[in-house]
């Protein structure tokens, strides 16, 4: 793994340890839990909610996905 990519992951992992990141994920989880499918009135709103949920899931899972990608890259370096 080159230095630039290593720094990218180190900075990302530092971000994940901050109170701000933890608060953001907690807020996103609350918003996600409050979305009710039965309140969706039309197809346009359904697709909008679907997009919102995808973004929320991406952010909620970003830490785990980043850690896995970093581990995979480290394994490639040792092979």
Locations of regions flagged by a protein language model:
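Short acidic DE-rich linear segments
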Residues: 3, 71-79
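Compositionally biased amphipathic helical and low-complexity segments enriched in hydrophobic
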Residues: 6, 25, 47, 60-63, ...
């Amino acid at each position: 793994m080159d230095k630039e990519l290593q720094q990218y992951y180190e900075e990302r992992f530092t971000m994940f340890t901050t109170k701000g990141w933890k608060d953001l994920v907690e807020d996103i989880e609350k918003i996600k839990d409050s979305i009710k499918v039965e309140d969706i009135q039309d197809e346009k709103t359904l697709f909008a909610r679907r997009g919102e949920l995808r973004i929320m899931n991406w952010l909620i899972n970003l830490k785990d996905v980043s850690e896995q990608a970093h581990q995979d890259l480290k394994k490639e370096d040792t092979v």
